[in-house]
Regions:
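Exported/periplasmic ABC-transporter solute-binding proteins
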Residues: 4, 20-291
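C-terminal motif of bacterial Sec signal peptides marking the signal peptidase cleavage site
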Residues: 15-19
Length: 291
């Protein structure tokens, strides 16, 4: 009897090993099955731009805009959290500022176009949006000088070096030696390039005090309206209500929105229609995504 049990166990183990090895013999990577959608929070400029550009935002019968992001989506409150979530989950898909991309995650080609600066400039990659800086009326002398640097040839060179698309060919900036404080707040997508601009600006004006507070686009615009900050950052176009409140925007740069997956996910490309279907919860399995 013991001998018979032993034989059964050996056969069971052998069959299990054969089943495990069967996938390796195909030589192909296996898709990770169920899709885990990762989205930014409401108020995020990246989310606002993404749902508009990907067709996730629609109008209802009354003409009101409706965000159809899946209720099953995992909500993240910053670019870095989205990246960390996707990096740690083979089934995940999310979206981030192209300028924040690194080798920890993989950006998908959309409609046959890779997410690159050149493809955004040519229009081949369609998921792109502006970075705005906004002040309430006339900026303070210190804030105005910082903005002058950001839009200058030197400032726009920093924008390009940081992986974004410059907004304009500005003139030469001459250091003012300003010692004033400038409070900047808003989008987590705009923050990285603003940190680079701050570093370059302070290098030219060592006595300047530039403070940057990361949150989201809506918070940044509200902070500028309420006088909590001198300059608000938004990774989307300003809303009518924000313009009516007196905000005066300027386009700092253009940026793509990269649709990202885990590096171990074999999927490398999707159509924009597939992206929409995934993020509204119609497509829920990676095996439904054909390449």
């Amino acid at each position: 009897m013991k001998k018979m049990i032993g034989i059964v166990l050996v056969l069971t183990l052998a069959l299990g090993l054969a089943a495990c090895g069967g996938g390796d013999e195909t030589g192909g990577e296996q898709k990770p099955s169920m899709i885990s959608v990762v989205s930014r929070e409401e108020g995020s400029g990246t989310r606002g731009a993404f749902i508009e550009l990907a067709g996730i935002e629609e109008k209802d019968a009354a003409g009101n805009k409706v965000d159809r992001t899946s209720e099953m989506a995992e909500i993240s409150n910053s670019t870095s959290v989205v990246m960390a979530t996707v990096m740690g989950n083979k089934r995940a898909i999310g979206y981030i500022s192209l300028g924040s991309m690194n080798d920890d995650v993989k950006a998908l080609a959309i409609d046959g176009a890779d997410a690159t600066v050149d493809n955004i400039k040519s229009g081949a990659y369609s998921i792109a949006r502006p970075f705005h800086l906004a002040t309430l009326g006339a900026a303070s002398p210190a804030a105005a000088d910082f903005l002058a640097f950001a839009m200058s040839a030197q400032g726009q060179a920093v924008v390009e070096e940081s992986g974004y698309i410059s907004a304009a060919a500005g003139g030469d900036y001459k250091p003012s030696g300003t010692a004033g404080q400038v409070r900047i707040a808003g989008s987590s997508s705009v923050t990285p390039v603003m940190e680079k601009l701050k570093e370059a600006y302070v290098g030219l004006n060592p006595s300047a005090d530039i403070q940057i507070q990361q949150s989201d686009s809506t918070t940044g615009m509200t902070s500028a309206i309420e006088g909590i900050c001198d300059i608000g950052m938004a990774s989307r176009n300003l809303k009518d209500s924000e313009l009516e409140a007196g905000l005066e925007p300027v386009v700092l740069a253009m940026d793509g929105i990269a649709v990202i997956v885990n590096r171990e996910n074999p999927v490398s490309a999707m159509t924009l229609d597939q992206v929409r279907s995934v993020f509204i919860g119609e497509t829920t399995d990676w095996n439904e995504i054909g390449e």
